[in-house]
Amino acid sequence: MKLTLVILALVACVTAFSVPTQKVKIADKNFLEKQKFLFEIVHRIDEPLMFEEWIKMGQKLITDKAQYETFDFYMEKLWESYKLGALLPKGEFFGALVKTHHKQAYGLFNFFYYAKDWETFVRNVAWARIHVNEGMFVYALTLAVIHKPEFEGLILPQIYEIFPQYFFNSKFVYAAEKFDYEVFSKLTMYEKEYKDILYKDYSEFTGNFYFYTKDWKTWQWYKMMGLDQEWYVEDKYFLRENLSQFVNDPKYVDVVKGLKKFYMPVDYTRDIDFFNDETKMTYFTEDLGWNAYWYYLNMDYAFFLNGKQFGLDKDRRGEYWIYNVQQILARYYQERLANGFGEIPEFFWYKQIEYGYDPQLIYYNGIGYSYRKNYYDFYTYGKFEMYSQIQNFFSRVYKVLETGFYKTADGQVFDLHKPEAIKIVGNYLQGNADTFDKYFFNYYYLLAHMYFADVDYNDMEVFPNVFLNFETMLRDPFFYTFYKKFTDVFYTFKYYLKPYTQKDLFYEGITIKDVSVSKLVTYYDIVDFDVTNLLNDKMTFVDGQYIWDKALLARQARLNHKPFNFEFTIDSDKVQKGVVRVFLGPKFDEYGRVIPLDYNRKNFVQIDSFVYPFIAGTNTIKRSSKEFSWTAEDRITYTELYKYVMLASEGKYDFPLDISEPHNAFPDRLVLPKGWEQGMPMQFYFFVSPFAETYEQFSNFDYTYSSGVGSGTRFVDTKPFGYPFDRQIDESDFFVPNGFFKDVKVYYVDTFAKYFEKKYTQFGTFDYSIEY
């Protein structure tokens, strides 16, 4: 578990090379009580609250205005809606981007955020847990825990542990919700005799492997082991890459003592109803970490939060958000190349969407998510008025960029052909609360998502759709097609800025002589995700204390990579500080043609950035992918966190505030594209620029357990995100001694190939000796 700060951007990771040593804080009794409350209040979120302590606290919503720092319009409207029975009912689908849902969620968030003390907060949260829609409750609570200053260090389980229904297919969710330990125990006795006969001679299956695995894909690893999609006892440990960090902790034995664990192999979406090439990419687009990253980005920089009040303007929120969009598309494009696909399809207003999508998800109320058929025509089947508004937004933005200035409704004029105008353009594209013209730009973002989800302006009860929540929208290939419109505006803005000159890029006295890179290897490994919130059995309490004695796990194959290293050789003519940036991009397109640098700059992902104190002479810098501070390894699970809190509450464990990876970290395993067995050509670009900032990074927050959202000191310098790839490139000026390109290859290794090569002696059981 890292102690370093995770910087929230996919590539805007601008951190120090050497983070100053700081003692990790240990939670006191007061902190543990608060953490226990947060873990219990979201437990089995789609069921009635069963903790008597919190039921008593949640008898009424505190409406005394004296108990709040502010009591605003949205809070009044929420309270009125509740009294009139007009709140979104419990059990109904909640969409964060449905206008009617958003307004109620805003009011609920304010009841949480503006509470003057912990008791008022607890009473409001407990009341909302009992009376408010489950999805709306989690959305508002997540925002409050992230943004309320006095809650620094407190955490919630990951969103995929609170709502596994948003991340796993309906087949798995049904099985988890029906799980009954007593029935399971009896079934295993009968199944053992059956399996002993079935798997007695594995050689009988080798001649018919094609038929047995006719729809097999890499992530259906369980078929190669003779397993099926059913529940199995896990009598060893939670599978994850960084397992040793936990099992080597002597206290960990106490944590898992008496805990019964059950896992089920789980698959990704595949083409069941209609054929679609895009299903080849579902291991990536449906990756839990990939989707959770986008969710938490939009929680940290929620579009409706005021930048000045929450400090988000200090973090350059608009620029930061649109740059993340650009980087997500760049990373997605790299994965497309690894699978033989080309450019992300363009979005045209009056053209059919070639690829449909069936998420195969089911909401916790039993209603399946809506799907889109191949060659779907939004213009014909959608709501024309909303469609026109979305078109008008983009037309207006292009027009003001072309004219070079923008005049707001109150008469202010802004020059949009200056670099600092990216703040304005980014705010407009996100449609956030800091846009200068709120009459036009504020709600277009909501309307766009509502339109593509077939939701009308005033709809309250709507069908589930992946486009209405941040945690599900990256699953749909159409997300990348539509969001390409956002980056087109971004590139249009950059087009009017002159390319950097050699004088701009040159760092006097610094020369990158060479950078060696270790072999880049990707593979599929297997991991357990905690889905215990799907359990429906009876909860057991002893003396008022909940006994958490069972854990359900979703065991899934996911993309990963071997750790890799850089060794920089950099000459400096004097002692000085510099910022080292590392980018990874493709070399060729899907046809094997070299991609021109000026165009290819859009496809580079920044994977590292750090400050280094150069000495006079030759500097040798060694850096590992494990040191990337913006990424996270596999997280400690919800079940384990609760167990640790209870152990600490009994005085048997020192609970460190940095026990879990920051909520907004990007998954380390997705830094590299899948690659090819013969090696996929890629290229690194290394660039060193001067360090000349007046503020000290991490100076106003504790980096050991806080991500510093809204602090203004999260980033190591004030260069544009993506610098120097953020503008058009003039190749006659771009190549400078302090920049260096390195050709590499990414090799994919099939870790499951051994199951084809020889008899698998453990057929019908999980192979713990599998080498990743």
Curated annotation (Swiss-Prot):
Glycans are attached at residue 242. GO terms for cellular component: extracellular space; larval serum protein complex. Transmembrane segments: none annotated. One of its GO terms (molecular function) is nutrient reservoir activity. It comes from the Eukaryota. Pfam families: Hemocyanin_C, Hemocyanin_M, Hemocyanin_N. GO terms for biological process: energy homeostasis. The keyword Signal applies. The keyword Secreted applies. Residues 1-16 form the signal peptide. InterPro entries: Di-copper_centre_dom_sf, Hemocyanin/hexamerin, Hemocyanin/hexamerin_mid_dom, Hemocyanin_C, Hemocyanin_C_sf, Hemocyanin_N, Hemocyanin_N_sf, Ig_E-set. Larval hemolymph. Gene3D superfamilies: Di-copper center containing domain from catechol oxidase, Hemocyanin, C-terminal domain, Hemocyanin, N-terminal domain. Keywords: Glycoprotein, Secreted, Signal, Storage protein. Its main location: secreted. It is found in: Secreted, Extracellular space. SUPFAM superfamilies: Di-copper centre-containing domain, E set domains, Hemocyanin, N-terminal domain. Heterohexamer, composed of three subunits, alpha, beta and gamma. Larval storage protein (LSP) which may serve as a store of amino acids for synthesis of adult proteins. Belongs to the hemocyanin family. This is Larval serum protein 1 gamma chain. It comes from Drosophila melanogaster (Fruit fly). The lineage of its organism: Eukaryota, Metazoa, Ecdysozoa, Arthropoda, Hexapoda. The gene is Lsp1gamma.
